[in-house]
């Protein structure tokens, strides 16, 4: 599949979707995108910048949600212009898709909305590649009907994203088998290494996270074989306005990516058919 000018798939190198969880300010987005571009250029990694203009599913009703669509799109447009990278953002049921699609390169559907048929069709009809996040409550094989709904719109540029499965209360686990199962959708599979270590609602009025396990799960996913890695990152996760406990520090992204690209090359060198 062609995505933002480059090919993605199990026969292609790992690509990266990364950025802060939510748009906090113009300068933070530009600085983070600029640093990520430096790192990915150095390592030869295809990179898409991500950040959200509205986090509609915050634990607390008073938590920071973002600057809103109008201001958020201005920031993302400036990132594209100044840094020269493609951009991705989430959309919601109320989002004017055409307006967002006029700025961003990739649309993303929140995990909680994966079963909303009309929403999935609406997003996939906007004429942009779509990253569909698997719900924490959904089995990996249940992504097949979701993809069928998506592709029925005529959009063939669909990716599926694993972000962990609910395991009891306030906890997620990552079943690496799901990455192989979701290949049966015929779509590139992306692994979300940072939301997978989230502890949803684990801090009472906000979600916790186990950031130290990001490299563990990322390496495991790359060893299984994935097309892309999704990772939220921040210059200072302790001060992030959303999902700080599971965000990976920006200054540690290069070391992590370097390891992952080496693993990716070995995994894809040996192929997958003989293990099927």
Curated annotation (Swiss-Prot):
GO terms for biological process: keto-3-deoxy-D-manno-octulosonic acid biosynthetic process. It is an enzyme of class 2 (transferase). GO terms for cellular component: cytoplasm. It is found in: Cytoplasm. Coiled coil: none annotated. Transmembrane segments: none annotated. It comes from the Bacteria. Pathway: Carbohydrate biosynthesis; 3-deoxy-D-manno-octulosonate biosynthesis; 3-deoxy-D-manno-octulosonate from D-ribulose 5-phosphate: step 2/3; Bacterial outer membrane biogenesis; lipopolysaccharide biosynthesis. InterPro entries: Aldolase_TIM, DAHP1/KDSA, KDO8P_synthase. It catalyses: D-arabinose 5-phosphate + phosphoenolpyruvate + H2O = 3-deoxy-alpha-D-manno-2-octulosonate-8-phosphate + phosphate. Signal peptide: none annotated. HAMAP family: KDO8P_synth. Belongs to the KdsA family. This is 2-dehydro-3-deoxyphosphooctonate aldolase. The gene is kdsA.
């Amino acid at each position: 599949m062609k995505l933002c000018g480059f090919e993605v798939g199990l026969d292609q190198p790992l690509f990266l979707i990364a950025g802060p969880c939510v748009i906090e300010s113009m300068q933070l987005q530009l600085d983070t995108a600029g640093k990520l571009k430096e790192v990915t250029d150095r390592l030869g990694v295809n990179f898409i910048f991500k950040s959200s203009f509205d986090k509609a599913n915050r634990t607390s009703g008073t938590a920071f949600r973002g600057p809103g669509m109008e201001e958020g799109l201005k920031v993302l447009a400036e990132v594209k212009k100044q840094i020269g990278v493609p951009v991705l953002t989430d959309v919601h049921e109320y989002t004017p898709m055409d307006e967002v699609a006029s700025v961003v390169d990739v649309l993303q559907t929140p995990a909680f909305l994966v079963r909303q048929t009309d929403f999935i069709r609406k997003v996939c009809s906007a004429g942009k590649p779509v990253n569909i996040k698997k719900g924490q409550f959904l089995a990996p094989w249940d992504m097949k009907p979701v993809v069928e709904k998506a592709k029925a719109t005529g959009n063939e540029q669909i990716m599926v994203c694993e972000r962990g499965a609910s395991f009891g209360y306030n906890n997620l686990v990552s079943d690496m088998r799901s990455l192989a199962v979701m290949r049966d959708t015929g779509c590139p599979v992306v692994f979300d290494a940072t939301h997978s270590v989230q502890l949803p609602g684990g801090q009472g009025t906000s979600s916790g996270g186990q950031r130290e396990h990001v490299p563990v799960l990322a390496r495991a996913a790359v060893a299984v074989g994935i097309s892309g890695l999704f990772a939220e990152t921040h210059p200072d996760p302790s001060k992030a306005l959303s999902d700080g406990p599971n965000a990976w520090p920006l200054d540690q992204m290069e070391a992590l990516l370097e390891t992952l690209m080496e693993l990716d090359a070995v995994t894809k060198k040996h192929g997958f058919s003989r293990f099927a």
